[in-house]
């Protein structure tokens, strides 16, 4: 299964192949990412799920030996064409990485930094944007009295929510999360999962996770990948309760991976 017919598509992947040098890492991937829903990518290490995620904002262009072939349509426009404005694409498609990566600056400036690249706001408007982003990331009440302290002064879970706030401050349309909870404790993980569920009201969210329970709790749709291939893509409840492919069933029941 490669299509999920529910909400309108925000991202459409068509015949996508990806290479690290001569290594064929993604093989003829086809799937639709639903707008304003959460889509999870699961599969064993090395299956290609993070590679696929990073094609959505062309992170691979930082590395000359990596290349993508096929189409990735964002609202109908193929982002893989050379005419695509990378800065504009990454404003539309934000990303949060596995380990919290606050900038070496204040909590306030962590949020304002990206906004300043794309918008010229008055101080009052910037203050409002910072509060809005931190509130969306469920971090405002914990930081409102120390906005000028370093982002490094926050706990790991708070730092990850700061990174999410930073990502949404420029008001993207899509938010990519690459194993955002793998370095966090269970309480922080629970807060991030609640946040992911809330964020889909305003954003299309795509998350890579090793944690199948997390995918089941957070996502509307789940893609199972194995050795660079998309094995199954379905509504999350269906994929975990009545998988269509034996490989999927074997993985979610712990028989391999």
Swiss-Prot record:
GO terms for cellular component: ATP-binding cassette (ABC) transporter complex, substrate-binding subunit-containing; membrane; plasma membrane. Its EC number is 7.3.2.1. Disulfide bonds: none annotated. InterPro entries: AAA+_ATPase (IPR003593), ABC_transporter-like_ATP-bd (IPR003439), ABC_transporter-like_CS (IPR017871), P-loop_NTPase (IPR027417), PstB-like (IPR005670). PANTHER family: ABC TRANSPORTER I FAMILY MEMBER 17, PHOSPHATE IMPORT ATP-BINDING PROTEIN PSTB. Belongs to the ABC transporter superfamily. Phosphate importer (TC 3.A.1.7) family. This is Phosphate import ATP-binding protein PstB.
């Amino acid at each position: 299964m490669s299509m999920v017919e529910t909400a309108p598509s925000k991202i459409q992947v068509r015949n996508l192949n990806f290479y690290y040098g001569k290594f064929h890492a993604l093989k003829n991937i086809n799937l639709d990412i639903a707008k304003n829903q959460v889509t999870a990518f699961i599969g064993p290490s090395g299956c290609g799920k993070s590679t696929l995620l990073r094609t959505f904002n062309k992170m691979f262009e930082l590395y000359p030996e990596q290349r993508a072939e096929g189409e990735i349509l964002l609202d109908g426009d193929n982002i893989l064409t050379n005419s695509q404005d990378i800065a504009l694409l990454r404003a539309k498609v934000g990303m949060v990485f596995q380990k919290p990566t606050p900038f070496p600056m204040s909590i306030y400036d962590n949020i304002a930094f990206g906004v300043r690249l794309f918008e010229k706001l008055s101080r009052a408007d910037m203050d409002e944007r910072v509060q809005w982003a931190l509130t969306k990331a469920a971090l405002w009440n914990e930081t409102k009295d120390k906005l000028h302290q370093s982002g490094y002064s926050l706990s790991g879970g708070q730092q990850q929510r700061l990174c999410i706030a930073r990502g949404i401050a420029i008001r993207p349309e899509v938010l990519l999360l690459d194993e955002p909870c793998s370095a966090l404790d269970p309480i922080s993980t629970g807060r991030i999962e609640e946040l992911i569920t809330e964020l889909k009201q305003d954003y299309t969210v795509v998350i890579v996770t090793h944690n199948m329970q997390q995918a089941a709790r957070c996502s509307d749709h789940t893609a199972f990948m194995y050795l660079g291939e998309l094995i199954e893509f379905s509504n999350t409840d269906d994929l975990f309760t009545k998988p269509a492919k034996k490989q999927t069933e074997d993985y979610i029941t712990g028989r391999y991976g």
